[in-house]
Regions:
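C-terminal effector/interaction modules appended to NTPase cores
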Residues: 1-86
Length: 86
């Protein structure tokens, strides 16, 4: 689980708590759940999101950049904080 600053480039509606795109980070591509700090993000919004990979953990570093997508939805982000596994 990690925190990230994201920018929503395109999305047909709103990104809400529980949104599940595929996150592409380095060589990893994994489904993840998004939990926006503000409750929702609209296209063009920039915000803080808590992200959790659905199936397996990955090694992350603060500052890494990633892309997320699902259908027509696309966005980019930067890892800002990492929660310890537990």
């Amino acid at each position: 689980e990690f925190e990230a600053d994201v920018v929503v480039l395109n999305h047909p509606t709103r990104i809400r708590d529980g949104y599940e795109p595929v996150v592409h980070l380095e060589t990893a591509s994994e489904a993840a759940t998004f939990h926006p700090a503000s409750g929702q993000l609209l296209p063009g919004d920039r915000g803080s999101v808590r992200i959790r990979f659905k199936f397996r953990p990955y090694l992350l570093e603060v500052g890494q950049r990633f892309v997320f997508r699902e259908g027509q939805s696309k966005g980019v982000g930067t890892v800002t904080d990492i929660s310890p596994a537990g």
